[in-house]
Amino acid sequence: MTKTIMLANPRGFCAGVDRAIAIVERAIELYGAPIYVRHEVVHNRFVVDDLRGKGAVFIEELKDVPPGSTLIYSAHGVPLSVRAEAEALGLTVFDATCPLVTKVHVEVKRMNKAGMEIIMIGHAGHPEVEGTMGQVDAGIYLVQTVDDVATLRVVNEDQLSYVSQTTLSVDETRDIIAALKARFPNIHSPKKDDICYATQNRQDAVKLLADQCDIVVVVGSPNSSNSNRLREVAALKGVDAYMVDNASLLEPEWFAGKRRVGVTAGASAPEVLVQAVIDRIKAFDVTQVTELPGVEESTVFALPPALRPLF
């Protein structure tokens, strides 16, 4: 049985990931190795291993950073306590926090200053959630599901607002927001939807892909939130959906009896991994590869001034 590979568009790296990787590479170029990075700069094993080979040292605790070293915050952002600790240690710091995550941080501080309690829609333990909730000392509560909304306790229902993790499922978040508004009619919304453009575009693209395919393969690492959401979105469309870190994890039996194979990638997965997956699937009697139409992304985020090229 001949097969066709269909590629989602857009897929792979977003502007925030491009910027975060460039910050690490540029810091190594200017300051020399080692450059310390708090947490994986983006959630992709291939990217992290590549940067480690160039001289990046990934740590979770600042106690592991020698005094006077250069430190980079990951794209997911950090709590205010980490910034204070880095300053106390006299570290040279570059911030690779995605600007769209920083926007949520600013929103949280604004809401807190206005005297509002804040509900954070997100996944417990994710570094973006920890960073966002760590922008204020108190008065912020985590909600992960619609069921959580029913048991939520707040001090003042009339002084309540919400923000979201930027990499969530658009549809799932919509349901949670609807539940919040039903229980707390006076809840304040953020000025703009917190789900980032790249998350939205990739989820829209995988829905289109799943509608035309018998199976969808998402390229992404297990700890990548947006990659996991892509697999879930595809599965909800009723097709077999798998997520793989690399081509070696593909199982031939997945493709038995499948004629149209969809491939996409999370925002932290490089195109080189996608091409390797395509090459591997081609061995399963694939006759053609086609790319679906999609949204063209032109967003570019600038590097910190000290890391920008002079010319």
From Swiss-Prot:
- MF annotations from Gene Ontology: 4 iron, 4 sulfur cluster binding; 4-hydroxy-3-methylbut-2-enyl diphosphate reductase activity; metal ion binding
Q: Where does (2E)-4-hydroxy-3-methylbut-2-enyl diphosphate bind?
A: 43, 76, 126, 166, 224-226, 268
Detail which positions bind [4Fe-4S] cluster.
14, 98, 196
Keyword Zinc-finger listed = no
- Cofactor (UniProt): [4Fe-4S] cluster
Q: Which Pfam families does this entry report, sorted A to Z?
A: LYTB
UniProt KW Iron keyword: yes
Indicate the residues that form the catalytic site.
128
Q: In which pathway does it act?
A: Isoprenoid biosynthesis; dimethylallyl diphosphate biosynthesis; dimethylallyl diphosphate from (2E)-4-hydroxy-3-methylbutenyl diphosphate: step 1/1; Isoprenoid biosynthesis; isopentenyl diphosphate biosynthesis via DXP pathway; isopentenyl diphosphate from 1-deoxy-D-xylulose 5-phosphate: step 6/6
Q: Where does dimethylallyl diphosphate bind?
A: 43, 76, 126, 224-226, 268
Q: How is the cofactor bound?
A: Binds 1 [4Fe-4S] cluster per subunit.
Q: Which residues bind isopentenyl diphosphate?
A: 43, 76, 126, 224-226, 268
Q: Which UniProt keywords apply?
A: 4Fe-4S, Iron, Iron-sulfur, Isoprene biosynthesis, Metal-binding, Oxidoreductase
> Which CDD domains would you find in this protein's record?
lytB_ispH (cd13944)
Family annotation (InterPro entries): LytB/IspH (IPR003451)
E.C. number(s) listed in UniProt:
1.17.7.4
- Catalysis: reaction(s): isopentenyl diphosphate + 2 oxidized [2Fe-2S]-[ferredoxin] + H2O = (2E)-4-hydroxy-3-methylbut-2-enyl diphosphate + 2 reduced [2Fe-2S]-[ferredoxin] + 2 H(+); dimethylallyl diphosphate + 2 oxidized [2Fe-2S]-[ferredoxin] + H2O = (2E)-4-hydroxy-3-methylbut-2-enyl diphosphate + 2 reduced [2Fe-2S]-[ferredoxin] + 2 H(+)
- Name its GO BP terms in alphabetical order: dimethylallyl diphosphate biosynthetic process; isopentenyl diphosphate biosynthetic process, methylerythritol 4-phosphate pathway; terpenoid biosynthetic process
Query: Which PANTHER family does the entry mention?
Result: 4-HYDROXY-3-METHYLBUT-2-ENYL DIPHOSPHATE REDUCTASE
Family indicated by similarity: Belongs to the IspH family.
The job of this chain, per UniProt, is described as:
Catalyzes the conversion of 1-hydroxy-2-methyl-2-(E)-butenyl 4-diphosphate (HMBPP) into a mixture of isopentenyl diphosphate (IPP) and dimethylallyl diphosphate (DMAPP). Acts in the terminal step of the DOXP/MEP pathway for isoprenoid precursor biosynthesis.
Which protein are we looking at? Answer: 4-hydroxy-3-methylbut-2-enyl diphosphate reductase
Q: Which organism is it from?
A: Chromobacterium violaceum (strain ATCC 12472 / DSM 30191 / JCM 1249 / CCUG 213 / NBRC 12614 / NCIMB 9131 / NCTC 9757 / MK)
**Which gene name belongs to this protein?**
ispH
